[in-house]
Amino acid sequence: MARNHITPELALDALSPVAAFRNGASFTDKTSKGVTSPAWAWNKSTLNPKNRINSLSPSHHPTWRLDGCTSLGTQFYTAPTFFSPVRPLHIHTFIPTPSQWPLGLRSLLGIDSAFLYRDSRINNFHIAQYVLRTLEHWSSTIHDFQSMYEALPFGSRIVFENIENDITKIRIRIVRTHDLERQLMSITSWPSRLTKCPSAILPPTLDISRLHLVQQLHDSTAIVELRRPRTEADIFRKTGTDIVVFKTLSDSPSYLYYELSILLTMPPHPNIIPAPLHIITKKVRFGSKLAIVGFTLPCLSRDSLRDILPRRRIQGSLHLHDQIKWALQVTSALKHIRDKGPGWYCDLRLDNVLLSDSDDVVLIDFEQRGVLPSFAPPEIRYLDCIVALVKDSSLDCGVKEEYKKLYEEHIGPIIDEKIMAEYHGNIPWLCQSRSKREALQVYMLGRLLWCIFEGVSAPQVEIWMEYLYEPEVEFPVFKLTPMELRPLIESCTQGWTQSDNEVKRKGRCLVGTTDGKKYELGVALDAFTKIWKEELERGKMFLKQKTDCQMHNGTVGSAHLDTPSLDKVLETLVNFGKLL
């Protein structure tokens, strides 16, 4: 492992505000675990023939497949292929964090590069074949594996307890998530969630056994094939296909049910994903409850703007009339959500903006979890930091008390986690007024408009993941955006601050922002610690300014009261479109 390469541990720690309160020594100890002399001894070395992994080449007749990963390379979307059909039971494979591995295996399996990739590109690394070969051996030792697998509770986990050169020595256990199934809502109690909109039409229900897993796209989203009797009415006649998207829970069921209620009660809009086609149920073992585990949506064949924008720009097929059309459609969708939907949408990012077959925008994902820091408004970023620090158990009591006070001042009383689970959405957004939420959405829209007109995948290169097309220019630099639209984007993104980031990722390496010099891990951590300390101080000043503004004006404080409304953004885009 090169000392100037990004690692999962560094990415995890450096992207958390907790890094502001950690020292380099403790971090180095953490990432160097297992790097002591025994790991280099001949009897442990991977150069020793007896320690070599039997094979890391793809199997000629694979019995498992891997569709992607998440959680910095510790959670894999795996599925057996030696029986069919496979139901989308959300059973994923989990491995230990790399800090618990023998050092030689970290390098051999390529985890310090592989963790940057979340899609099928993970299969280009040895860790993918290692996981697949291990699952193949493990499943072959279990009698009637199919029956055992299909009887598992929804969302169960296949857990590797250790990582060894010899895959037969890996201890694997199954975590049966009975507690998760107990949290699921029954189909009979679901209508009570729609009392505020009694006219909502419920889609038909289908048992999960009718779905055949085709591909796991993300933690909570899969492409599935609907298996139905020939006599059933063909509700897919319009699309001529039985392929649909299965949306399920990734952790807390509350987010899933909140999204489902929004999609069922919000009036349709041409640029918002339509209401679910089915509600998917599963009979759970305890109490014989028929529980809601997800819903199906139409499957859009096109990619998201995250990949389409840079691809078309590179190919020379990204045209201004398409860009302005997409910008108008996204803004129109946000207005619809404001006026006829839940009132706000905090998940606005490029991978949640898909294209239909007609090349029109379709907005997806209404869990209301929030977005990456690169799209989040400054105020939300700062409040997210406060929430994270209050929840972290490793911090000094004095530090936690300081941020508990900030939490209570700017968010509200600290509520027990179990009670908070009943609230749906991102906590910092929940404490905002209606007008403030619109201003925050306009900020995110401004960042997204910049990406659309610059033809890039994101506002910046991320430390913890690599896009299929890495951004070649970073916000707020303008190169391709029409001059007439630049003032609009600047007014939308008021409050953006240039962080004095000393380090960034270039490929696998950490380099200095100004000189391009490669950083070793200890130096990089010191830089991230400094960055986070400065970010937290900026946050305190920002929130104080907001409070002072509120006290003097008697209104909800805002550092930027002249942020344009969604109506104004739409008007500006329409007027520009008339000039084309």
Give the label of every model feature segment.
Residues 2-187, 390-580:
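Helical subdomain adjoining the active site within ATP-dependent kinase catalytic cores
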Residues 186-278:
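ATP-binding glycine-rich loop module of kinase domains
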Residues 337-356:
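Catalytic-loop of the protein kinase fold
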Residues 253-254, 273-322:
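Conserved structural core of kinase catalytic domains
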Residues 326-327:
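Activation segment signature within eukaryotic-like protein kinase domains
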Residues 352-368:
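Conserved protein kinase catalytic/activation segment
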Residues 376-383:
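Regulatory activation segment
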